[in-house]
Swiss-Prot record:
GO molecular function: FAD binding; flavin-dependent halogenase activity; monooxygenase activity
EC class of the enzyme, as a word: oxidoreductase
Annotated coiled-coil segments of the chain: none
Biological role: Flavin-dependent halogenase; part of the gene cluster that mediates the biosynthesis of aspirochlorine (or antibiotic A30641), an unusual halogenated spiro compound with distinctive antifungal properties due to selective inhibition of protein biosynthesis, and which is also active against bacteria, viruses, and murine tumor cells. The non-ribosomal peptide synthetase (NRPS) aclP is responsible the formation of the diketopiperazine (DKP) core from the condensation of 2 phenylalanine residues.
EC numbers on record: 1.14.14.-
Glycosylation sites: 242, 303, 419, 458, 498
Pathway the protein acts in: Mycotoxin biosynthesis
N-terminal signal peptide: 1-21
Disruption phenotype: Abolishes completely the formation of aspirochlorine and leads to the accumulation of dechloroaspirochlorine.
Keyword tags: FAD, Flavoprotein, Glycoprotein, Monooxygenase, Oxidoreductase, Signal
Annotated residues for binding of FAD: 14, 17, 47, 330
Alphabetized SUPFAM superfamilies for the sequence: FAD/NAD(P)-binding domain
Name this protein carries in UniProt: Flavin-dependent halogenase aclH
Species name: Aspergillus oryzae (strain ATCC 42149 / RIB 40) (Yellow koji mold)
Amino acid sequence: MSIPNRCTVLVVGGGPAGSYAAAALAREGVDTVLLEADVFPRYHIGESMLPSIRHFLRFIDLDSKFDSYGFVNKNGAAFKLNSKPEAYTDFIAAGGPGSHAWNVVRSEADHLMFKHAGENGAQVFDGVKVNSIEFEQIDGLTVDPSLSELGRPVSATWSCKATGGKGSITFEYLIDATGRAGLVSTKYMKNRRYNQGLKNVASWGYWSNAGSYGVGTPREGDPYFEAIEDGSGWVWLIPLHNGTTSIGVVMNQEAATAKKRETGATTKDLYLNTIKNTPGVWQLLDKAELQSDLKSASDWSYNASSYASPYLRIVGDAGCFIDPFFSSGVHLALASGLSAALTIRAAQRGDCDEQAAVSWHSKKVAEGYTRFLLVVMSALKQISDREKPVLTDFDEDSFNRAFDFFRPIIQGTADVDKNLTQAEIAQTIEFCVQAFQTASTDEQDAVMTKVAAINSQNGTEGALRELHASLSADERRTLTTIQARQIIRSEDQMNIDNFTIDVIDGMVPRLERSSLGLARFVPKAQTSREDGLRATLGLPEKQKSIFSY
């Protein structure tokens, strides 16, 4: 099969975001071509998945292939952020049997996704690099004023190193899934920006004969994450099905540079010394041996001012990336890939015009990035326990949008009109840090029982007063923990429910085979008094979190 001269949608990049978008579009009958520069299977970091991945994969009928492949099942994850006992997120307790995720070898998992796109009708080619994009000016369509001169993409040039072949392909839509290279963001839009508060460097390698966290318990084989004792970063330990264990060190770049300078250590010296001084990880390595060369990466966190323009969608790491702390990379990749596919279909089907589709996708990607950024910032603040300017480079519009969900709970008011201040951002992070505090299931059940028992006739404000008057100091702390866990939307890690109910510009996704697109949002009927109180407190209608509530 040869690369065609024309297609409806060209997807550049065959990682999770690109392969997912290509599969979703091809299943809708869209003429889709997927070009990947590397030859599969190809290496990639990011082995630990979130349970939400299963639900994204199920939408394109790919979950059963992951289940049968032999990857290590991930029933949860352990996080030791400070001197207190590690916290454990239990996927099975929250979602029931079959709610596990996986620890994957990315070269194999990504290849599964790439092949699946082809099996579902996309024309897929690896070893083919896209070198340039040609744009044409269009009138009357722009969302981001800074991109008004870009125009719409109409063709791409490609080359194949193995054969020496070269060519070009024209298209109606382009999806940029080129990973950290970010072809469109860095070469054409030139709108990528790094978060200076998350200037980290990571080094990692693969060990043989490493021990496992939780041996003899249902937690055996789950990833283990531990903070470095001086607060400069953290270490991951992820068992893989090929018999190796991925162990990585993520450290603030300034701290890593200072430690090397003070001790004369090499990158490998710093890596090994850090692991030796991380007790929980080191005790699992008494018989282990580092069997690979170290790999390194820096500048983990970046985003952009826009993730779409007319007839163009940017997905996955090509647009933004945070930090591997909560395994958010593949989650955000698949979410953005699905967003790209459904907004293209929405415009094609007439659900909305192209400008509205562009706006929806860009806001959806920005919101997902911002929510996970808040989670990571809260966790890193818990690790470092010191003031750091972690959100100096945030996207104000998207953070304002995400903060709309947080401010009423933190301030006890529904006022969401004013712009954010740095103090409010700090307050948000401080509040969300409470999500990492311990609260037993019994303690949470007791508090939620009291929430359900409130039957005030004085409206929501009266119900809030009655509730807080009925709670002890310890119960109020437990309530704060429950609220914080809902603010950081921990259920996003379990399923894709929130993907289908998030209202952006008055529209919600329609995730139906053969009808993929956007639909106008229709508000629900009046809620009950208890539901209203739960909503005001930021508590869930039903138990669906990786935490107890």
